[in-house]
Design a protein with these regions (language model features):
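Individual transmembrane alpha-helices with interfacial aromatic-anchor signatures
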Residues: 64, 140-159
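Hydrophobic cores of alpha-helical transmembrane segments in multi-pass inner/ER membrane proteins
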Residues: 77-79, 159-163
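Interfacial loop at the N-terminal end of multi-pass membrane proteins
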Residues: 2-5, 10, 14-98, 124-142
C-alpha cells in the first residue's frame, strides 16, 4: 500500500503568518547587522588605542572581524531565505520592498567580497609585513596592507549603510 502525500493548501491566514515571520526575520537580521557593525566600528579605535602592540591589537581585532563575518554569513542566509519567502507570498518586489531588497543585496555582497577577497589578501600582506611594531611605515608590504585596509574600511561602511537603508526602507 502506497502512501500519498496530499498537497497542502496555503490559506490566506497561513500566507499572512509566513509573510509576518519573514518580515520579522529580515528586520531582526538587518538590526543585528547594523548593531554589530556599530560595535565593531567602535571597538577598533579603542583596541588600537589601548593595546600597546599593533600586532596584538591587529590579531585581536582580526579575530573579532572574522567571527562577526561568520555571524553576517548566517544573517545573510536568513535575509535571503526570508526574502524568497516574501516573494513567494507576495509575488512582487515593488516600492519600499524593492529598495530594501536592493540595499540588503548590496550589504550581503560587501560581506561576501570582504570575506572571500579582501580579508585573505590582508592576511597575506600581514604575513609579508611580519611585525607592524617593527616594520617601518614605508615598507612596500605595509604600504599595500594599509591601502587595502583603507579599501576594506570603505567597503565595510558601504555594507553598514546599505543594511541600515534596507532596515529603514522595510515596509511596516
Amino acid at each position: 500500500m502506497r502512501s500519498r502525500l496530499t498537497p497542502q493548501r496555503i490559506t490566506v491566514h497561513s500566507r499572512s503568518v509566513l509573510l509576518e515571520a519573514a518580515a520579522q526575520v529580515i528586520r531582526f537580521s538587518l538590526a543585528a547587522w547594523v548593531g554589530g557593525t556599530l560595535v565593531v566600528v567602535l571597538a577598533a579605535p579603542l583596541l588600537f588605542g589601548e593595546i600597546g602592540s599593533r600586532d596584538l591589537a591587529g590579531r585581536i581585532f582580526g579575530e573579532l572581524l572574522r567571527r562577526f563575518e561568520a555571524v553576517k554569513h548566517v544573517l545573510s542566509l536568513a535575509i535571503v531565505l526570508a526574502t524568497f519567502a516574501e516573494l513567494e507570498t507576495t509575488r512582487s518586489l515593488e516600492g519600499r520592498r524593492f529598495v530594501a531588497g536592493a540595499a540588503a543585496f548590496v550589504a550581503i555582497a560587501t560581506n561576501v567580497y570582504l570575506a572571500m577577497v579582501v580579508r585573505p589578501r590582508l592576511a597575506y600582506f600581514r604575513m609579508k609585513v611580519g611585525s607592524f611594531d617593527e616594520t617601518p611605515p614605508e615598507n612596500p608590504w605595509r604600504v599595500r596592507f594599509n591601502r587595502l585596509h583603507r579599501r576594506s574600511t570603505v567597503i565595510l561602511m558601504i555594507g553598514w549603510i546599505s543594511a541600515a537603508v534596507a532596515l529603514a526602507a522595510r515596509p511596516n
